[in-house]
From Swiss-Prot:
It holds the Pfam family MRP_L53. Residues 1-50 form a transit peptide. Transmembrane segments: none annotated. GO terms for cellular component: mitochondrial large ribosomal subunit. It comes from the Eukaryota. This is Large ribosomal subunit protein mL53. Keywords: Mitochondrion, Ribonucleoprotein, Ribosomal protein, Transit peptide. The keyword Mitochondrion applies. InterPro entries: mtLSU_mL53 (IPR052473), Ribosomal_mL53 (IPR019716). It is found in: Mitochondrion. Belongs to the mitochondrion-specific ribosomal protein mL53 family.
Length: 129
């Protein structure tokens, strides 16, 4: 069974920058429908998508802004469609790892670990005999 993919999850904006007449834009042009289709837009309505059609011979780039404010650019002139999808998913996973590392955890010292735990006396049925 195919895994459902939500490319726009955790993204605040996506900007496609490319020259439509450049022959190296095949991958970026095939990626655009994945983010502009009805299902993708319904799953992430807060993500804005825009296009910047640049001058001739501009190399194709996807600028991504994540919900936490991080911005990344992906140059797509030498990438295939699946490589673009995988790189975006890896970026989202790395953002998630950074968020987890930033979370404060209670620090446990070696003294706390080695200190014995005080147990209450068993007052069950055996103690009442």
């Amino acid at each position: 069974m195919r895994e459902k993919l939500n490319l726009l999850a955790k993204l605040k904006s996506v900007v496609y920058k490319f020259d439509p007449l450049n022959p190296n834009t095949r991958s970026i042009r095939s990626f655009i429908p994945l983010t502009t289709c009805k299902r993708s837009r319904q799953l992430a309505p807060e993500c804005s998508i825009s296009f910047d059609l640049g001058p001739q011979n501009t190399s194709p780039v996807i600028d991504i802004k994540f919900v936490n404010g991080t911005e990344k650019s992906i140059k797509t002139d030498t990438l295939e469609l699946m490589s673009i999808v995988e790189s975006i998913e890896l970026l989202k996973k790395s953002i998630r790892i950074e968020e987890i590392e930033k979370m404060k955890t209670t620090e446990t010292t070696l003294q706390d670990i080695l200190q014995p735990v005080n147990k209450k006396k068993d007052t069950g049925a055996k103690a009442n005999r």
